[in-house]
Design a protein with these regions (language model features):
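Alpha-helical transmembrane segments and immediately membrane-proximal extracytoplasmic
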Residues: 1-176
Length: 176
C-alpha cells in the first residue's frame, strides 16, 4: 500500500495501472482455485488426464482455461496458444463424450479426448500433420487404427474449420 501511495501525487495513472494488475492477479487466483486443473501447461496436463494421473472436471477446466488465458492476455503477459488449446480440446472431448452418454467405455473416452486435443493443437498452430504426431506419439503413446481415425478426423475438421472461418471473416488464420 505504501508503494501505491508514493505514486498518488505524481503519477495517478501508474497507481491505477498497478491496482488493475493486482485486481487481475486476484481474479486469476480465484479462477485457478476454482479450477486447479487449468493451472500449468496444457499439454502435460492433458497427458496426465489421458493417462489417469490427473483428475479433472471438464466444464471447470474448460471455463478456467479460457478465462485465465483471456486474463493473462489482457494483463500483457506472454501466452502461447498451443497449450491452452490442447487442454481446451481435451476437456471438450470429455464433455462431449459425457453429454452424449459416455457408454462406450474408458478407451473410447480417451480416443475422443486425444482427437480433440490434437484438434486443439492443429487449430492453434495450423500444422495438421504435427498435430497428428503430437496426439499419437506424445499424448497417447499408443497406436491403433481407431485412434488414428479419431485423431485424423478431429485434426482435419479443426484445420478446415479454422481455414473456413479465416476466409469468412477475411482474417489471417494466425489470429484464431
Amino acid at each position: 500500500a505504501a508503494f501505491l501511495l508514493r505514486f498518488r501525487g505524481t503519477a495517478p495513472a501508474a497507481a491505477l495501472f498497478f491496482l488493475a494488475l493486482a485486481a487481475l492477479a486476484f481474479l486469476l487466483s480465484v479462477i485457478l482455485k476454482w479450477a486447479p486443473s487449468a493451472n500449468g501447461g496444457g499439454i502435460p496436463t492433458a497427458m496426465g488426464i489421458l493417462r489417469g494421473i490427473v483428475t479433472f472436471k471438464w466444464l471447470r477446466t474448460f471455463v478456467g482455461v479460457i478465462a485465465s488465458s483471456v486474463i493473462t492476455f489482457f494483463a500483457g503477459m506472454p501466452l502461447c496458444n498451443d497449450g491452452p488449446s490442447v487442454l481446451i480440446g481435451a476437456s471438450l472431448g470429455r464433455g462431449v463424450n459425457s453429454l452424449l452418454g459416455g457408454k462406450k467405455g474408458a478407451a473410447w473416452d480417451r480416443y475422443v479426448m486425444t482427437g480433440c486435443a490434437g484438434a486443439g493443437f492443429a487449430a492453434a498452430t495450423m500444422s495438421p500433420l504435427t498435430a497428428v504426431f503430437i496426439a499419437l506419439e506424445e499424448i497417447h503413446k499408443k497406436f491403433s487404427p481407431m485412434l488414428l481415425m479419431a485423431v485424423f478426423s478431429s485434426v482435419l475438421s479443426a484445420t478446415a474449420t479454422t481455414r473456413l472461418l479465416g476466409e469468412l471473416f477475411k482474417v489471417d488464420t494466425a489470429f484464431f
